[in-house]
Amino acid sequence: MSPGRDFVRAIRDALQPAKAENGRAAREHDSFFESRDAISRFLFVQDDPAPVDLCFVLGCSTPSNMDPAIELFRKGWTPKILISGYGRGHTELPEHELFRRYALERSVPKSALLIEPEATNTLENFTFSKAVIESELGWERIKRVALVTKPFHMRRALMTARGQWPDHLELIALPAKVPGEPLADTWWHNEDGRRYVFAELRAIGAYGLAKNLGRV
């Protein structure tokens, strides 16, 4: 049985406290919750909203991921929103177009939107957008950036930004909370949540081995 499946089974067993009847079982039970909570603290990062020079939104198949960026704009806390991503063909339209239309329908003016139309993965989101920011805004004008992505994806987004973007930036994590998406306090409750989280941990490992990440 694979390590991933072993861990899933350990999760299921640990969620049944009646099995922790002796000292060893109790220690294993406690160890599971410590591991689960450590994973949650590592992956799921969230800051308080604050004024920024740019809001950067990573595309996906769920356009309501735009909501934190739209809220920042409505408050006057960001002058520009950069949407990045073509996607992987899981949507009828490119992800950037889905997000652009979603924002326009919610009264964000076209002049406030920047588009990076080609990225198909997280690394490309940041490497391709780096040139867009330089040409459209200039990095010297950007000091603080809000990152918007799925909650379980935020750690990799932050670390990739640190590895690919200028060192002087202050980064703010604003995860988009969409119904049904894994959250820090629920991801282990179902197979989809566990699958997303384990896949994200593997992806962070792969990005780290490829030297694509920076320290957060």
Question: What is each PLM-predicted segment?
Answer:
Residues 182-216:
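A structured, mid-to-C-terminal "fold-capping" secondary-structure block
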Residues 2-189, 193-194:
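A structural signal for short, hydrophobic/glycine-enriched beta-strand patches
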